[in-house]
Amino acid sequence: MTKHLPTISDISPLLKAEILAEALPYIRAYHGKTIVIKYGGNAMVEERLKESFARDVILLKLVGMNPVVVHGGGPQIDEALKKIGKTGTFIQGMRVTDEETMEVVEWVLGGEVQQDIVMLINHFGGQAVGLTGKDGGLIHAKKMMIPSDAEPGKKIDIGFVGEIEAINPAVVKALQDDAFIPVISPIGFSAEGQAYNINADLVAGKMAEILHAEKLVMMTNIPGVMDKDGKLLTDLTAREIDALFADGTISGGMLPKISSALDAAKSGVNSVHIIDGRIEHSLLLEILTEQAFGTMIRSR
């Protein structure tokens, strides 16, 4: 039986008013601060959640915060690959990306998905601008080789998958200063102009670090980080995360997500959260209320 996930219609008018009143100190505290949001999962697929997300981002901008959206698009890439008879393959949470897959990734992320997000934000009254790593030299990347689990010391070539060498935040800051909302596709480029597919969690974490963000919020399809019994872990330190890596509790697609979140926390991002994007207005609930939500990642 599918568990009912709350929507805004489940909340009484009185509670809505209380939430607005509760938001005031957070609006003051985060005014002028940068909030980096990794947008992915069901929140990018279901129309109700897509509209909820767009409205949330616009509201954050209207009350004086500087939201920066870094989006994924795994399901959309898988669907596009399926149409040309290809199946996605992942190693350690990273998509193996041959030349044909890279062309699909560029088209889906930098085109279809990004345009959908930008158009939706603009439709509801915001001013969003889409970016890829090529725009303004935003994301400089090089080929990633990942360590083999089976053969220590050996590196695995997973194709046109990149790791971030540097981020030039000038174009993002310029857009923020002009009241725009940057929407960033996780595609990096080498000095030779080669495009690389970069995990969106890694881009979001590095962007939060470089922009000296107050918060990094990662939206997922689960309530947060779960233990082996399915219980939500609401607060994790670096030492606890290392233990979860070692015993296999954190694996697959969660590996780059948690690693990126922890790196951001260590770099000085004040608050790093992994939240359930399936809940309507989860972004506002995380940023503007006292409600403990999802998993907080701390460096110590």
Swiss-Prot record:
Gene3D superfamilies: Acetylglutamate kinase-like. Pathway: Amino-acid biosynthesis; L-arginine biosynthesis; N(2)-acetyl-L-ornithine from L-glutamate: step 2/4. It catalyses: N-acetyl-L-glutamate + ATP = N-acetyl-L-glutamyl 5-phosphate + ADP. One of its GO terms (cellular component) is cytoplasm. GO terms for molecular function: acetylglutamate kinase activity; ATP binding. Keywords: Amino-acid biosynthesis, Arginine biosynthesis, ATP-binding, Cytoplasm, Kinase, Nucleotide-binding, Transferase. The record marks K38, K257 as: Transition state stabilizer. It is an enzyme of class 2 (transferase). Its EC number is 2.7.2.8. One of its GO terms (biological process) is L-arginine biosynthetic process. The keyword Amino-acid biosynthesis applies. This is Acetylglutamate kinase. It comes from Polynucleobacter asymbioticus (strain DSM 18221 / CIP 109841 / QLW-P1DMWA-1). The lineage of its organism: Bacteria, Pseudomonadati, Pseudomonadota, Betaproteobacteria, Burkholderiales.
